[in-house]
Structures are given as C-alpha cells and as structure tokens.
Amino acid sequence: MKFFKNKKNEIQESKYFSINEIDIKIEKYLDFDNGFFVELGANDGVNQSNSLYFEKYRNWKGVLVEPIPHNYLLCKKNRSLNSKVF
C-alpha cells in the first residue's frame, strides 16, 4: 500500500502500485480502457505491480508471469479473474 499527503495535508491511499511510479508515468501513453497487458516478474501481484492500476481502475485484462513459487501463489490469490497467472 502506498500513501501520500493531499493538498489539505491529509494522508490518503494511492491508487498506484508500481515502483518508481511507472504506472503513473505510462498512463499518459496508455490512456484508454479495456486494454491488455503482459507482466513478467509479477511478484505478489500487488507490490511493485506495473499492471494492477490498469486492471483495477481501467478494466484491463492480462497475463502475469511469476517464477518464484511463493510469490506465484500470492499473485494468484491477490489478482482478479481478469488476469491469468503463470
């Protein structure tokens, strides 16, 4: 979970998940709904995810690939039916 202070100095939860705010940066280039993604190295499906924002807020579907068994199981648990996890 990421948090930030808004203009009123209140703490709010961010709707973005990616490390270094990559999802924020690429949104201006991928500014459409119902897209498709492929994410390699999906981790647990939430932390440092480059695709979760697009799935959760822009109705994208896609494929997540995670080679570490423990993270793979977390990813399957954490992501919706809109994503296929391998």
Predicted feature locations:
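Non-catalytic N-terminal targeting/anchoring module and adjacent flexible stem/linker
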Residues: M1-S14
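SAM cofactor-binding core of SAM-dependent methyltransferases
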Residues: S14-F86
